[in-house]
């Protein structure tokens, strides 16, 4: 995924990786680390907080919205299931003039309720809708399990 993001932004001087808390932000940190090893692009890491029970509540970011202006932004989450979290994350950025906007997910479940897609994905997993994908990040091991 890191190489795909790099190739898509090869001419950029700076990109923003916006990770949806909690696991999306951890994944964004890992992508940032990989990008810094393979490119000279300055990476701004940004956390995005979405109330998953009430996604209409205001989305919070740890950087000023003016920093998005005319930048290439990649919104990162761990799992794309129904698309609810990702679509509200996308909505947050629609009020700002961006140079480019892409999405990245580790696991794409293919059960979307909204017209949102992952531009960069680790794996596409077609499962029954009642199954749950759990992503666990740790210092030694990271894993994805189907429950």
Question: Locations of the language-model features?
Answer:
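PRPP-associated nucleotide enzymes
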Residues: 1-147
